Amino acid sequence: MAEHVIIGNGVAGIKAAETIRKHDPDGKITMIGDEAYAFYYRPQLPEFVAGKIEEDRLWGKKKDFYEKNNITSHLGKTVTGIKPDTNEVILKDNTAINYDSLLIATGGSIKRRNYPGSDLNGGIVQLKTIDDAKNIKEKVKSAKSAVVVGEDFLTLSLTEALHSSGLKVTYLLRGDRLWPEIMDKDASDILLLRLKGKGITIKQETDIKEVYVKNKLIHGIITTDDELIDCQILGIVDKLQPSIGFLNESGVNTDNGVLVNNKMLTNFDNIYAAGDVAQLPADLDSDIPEINVRWLKAWKQGQVAGSNMAGNDAEYDDIASISATQICGIDIVSIGVSNPLNGDYKIMRGDYPHPEIDVYKKLVLKNDRVVGALFIGNVQEAREVTKVIKNRTNYSEIDKKLLKQMFDLNSRFGTFHGFLCPVCKLELPIPPDAKVGDKITCPACGIELNVTEKMLK
Ligand SMILES: Cc1cc2nc3c(=O)[nH]c(=O)nc-3n(C[C@H](O)[C@H](O)[C@H](O)COP(=O)(O)OP(=O)(O)OC[C@H]3O[C@@H](n4cnc5c(N)ncnc54)[C@H](O)[C@@H]3O)c2cc1C
């Protein structure tokens, strides 16, 4: 009987476990995760912090899921090393667990930059785990204001969550724009306007010079412009770094993340990696190897890895870099190379940006082929454009109706009546005969939802 071991109890790990169980009903499955909780929906943490949803809406699996599926779980346990020569995983308490096939699905952890005074942990927060979310909710009770510094979408999520919790929030951007990985300046300006409209103070090209601490408590920060800003909560967020430290002595090939091929296989023939920790080769001629934080990507890669661990021959053939989210009520979808930095790319963006409309759409071409796209505020054509990019279509071959709908402001709102899945944030098709209270399942990530009046509007 095969022994499958999965390190990481996030979406990539859980999807792999479910897939293995489907293909190998009798195989032994062991899951190890350092968070002491059953699987939960990480992208819903900001809404939980903001008090928009209760804790019970976070759970993706009940505690008895593991027992019911004959999975041995070690939750709250940390893996400190693996030994491919003896097929062993080593836990912090030195327990060794044997495997025939192993999945590394350890995601990433938020790197925090240090500033003078920031070694005092008291008021400094981050939002990655359910424990982080609970910690923030507790601190918000006695706080009036917060400062957040950073530019990518984890920082944006934290900023929005703190603001929605009722705090006065100042957001420091070290550069001139938000989320530079996917956004050009015009796209970023649309979102910045929305954040300002909500009452969030934005300071661009400003960093922290010093954290102002009194009686071991954070009282504020001093900016690089020598301004003192009061705050009791401080969010410092840098990029998510793949959690690969425990692989140092293992011989598993890593770069930024664990290097895998499109079967999610590492350089060992029985060790796989999937999700935020995995690094696929560059796709779409982008020169940029992809390892970005994306729920749906982790979900699909877990499925491919699980299938292969159970003896199949599955391949991950999606675009590695699709990102869908919602910030301040604005839908954002980025596909492929959405913000190229060198001059080999051509940008098509029709009538956008427009000073009065907070919608923005663009296509990125390389040698006439569409290699990337960005949608802000209206994501109506995102699914169609994903197919265009995946099929390596030339710009001249794209359906003219699709281009008109994307770029012609007169048809900008077209017929989109979609609803975005609260977990994977991709369009959720609502059946035409759906009624309030019916149950529907997101075809992309599998979450089950009750149909509400809002969805039917
Ligand atoms: C606040 C927030 C909002 C987000 N919003 C969106 C969104 O709107 N859209 C979107 O597409 N994505 C979003 N994401 C990103 C998305 O959640 C991730 O891409 C996804 O969770 C990655 O899944 P994973 O299984 O690869 O890793 P993870 O979900 O990070 O799970 C990995 C697990 O492995 C554990 N682990 C790590 N090291 C060890 C070890 N040595 N031993 C044992 N266990 C270990 C970790 O603690 C963790 O529990 C959001 C993330 C956050 C934090």
Residue spans for each PLM region:
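Short linker/helix segments within small regulatory modules
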Residues: P431-T441
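FAD-site-proximal beta/loop scaffold in flavoenzymes
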Residues: L120-K141, N215-L217, I222, E227-V304, ...
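Beta1-alpha1 glycine-rich phosphate/pyrophosphate-binding loop at the start
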Residues: A2-T72, F153, A161-I182, V423
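Short cysteine-rich clusters marking metal-coordination/redox-active sites
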Residues: C421-C424, C442-C445
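FAD-binding core/adjacent interface of flavoenzyme oxidoreductases
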Residues: M1-V5, W59-V147, E205, I222-D226, ...
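Short functional micro-motifs and their immediate structural scaffolds
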Residues: P429-P431, N450
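A Rossmann-like FAD-binding core segment of flavoenzymes
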Residues: D26-K28, S73-I90, I97, S164-N261
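Mid-to-C-terminal Rossmann-like scaffold of FAD/NAD(P)H-dependent oxidoreductases
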Residues: A2-E3, K22, V277-E381, F413-F419, ...
